[in-house]
Amino acid sequence: FGSLLGLCLITQILTGLFLAMHYTADTSSAFSSVAHICRDVNYGWLMRNIHANGASFFFICIFLHIGRGMYYGSYMFKETWNIGVILLFLVMATAFVGYVLP
């Protein structure tokens, strides 16, 4: 699942950059910029859907990756496991700041 995580991360970064090129964060025009992305940008609706569903798939892959590590006893490698826990917290914090707060 590590390679799927890398593929999801690259997809999220690329679609996020392309969506950010057309998005306006101003409160009066944010909704119209999303409508502009979906209607006027070539394959904008597809980029938006890939970005939204890719985030869910990314977290599913993370949890499957952690579950596989727990099943095979990888938690015995303390340093590696602790780095993974720190990365999990960073990913959750990034998702909170990027998706929940706005």
UniProtKB/Swiss-Prot annotation:
Heme b b562 binds at H51. SUPFAM superfamilies: Transmembrane di-heme cytochromes. Keywords: Electron transport, Heme, Iron, Membrane, Metal-binding, Mitochondrion, Mitochondrion inner membrane, Respiratory chain, Transmembrane, Transmembrane helix, Transport, Ubiquinone. Its cofactor is heme b. It is a multi-pass membrane protein. Binds 2 heme b groups non-covalently. It holds the Pfam family Cytochrome_B. GO terms for biological process: mitochondrial electron transport, ubiquinol to cytochrome c. Heme b b566 binds at H65. Its main location: mitochondrion. Coiled coil: none annotated. Gene3D superfamilies: Cytochrome Bc1 Complex, Chain C. GO terms for cellular component: mitochondrial inner membrane. The chain crosses the membrane at residues 1-21, 45-66, 81-101. It is found in: Mitochondrion inner membrane. One of its GO terms (molecular function) is ubiquinol-cytochrome-c reductase activity. PANTHER family: CYTOCHROME B (PTHR19271:SF16). The cytochrome bc1 complex contains 3 respiratory subunits (MT-CYB, CYC1 and UQCRFS1), 2 core proteins (UQCRC1 and UQCRC2) and probably 6 low-molecular weight proteins. Belongs to the cytochrome b family. Heme 1 (or BL or b562) is low-potential and absorbs at about 562 nm, and heme 2 (or BH or b566) is high-potential and absorbs at about 566 nm. This is Cytochrome b.
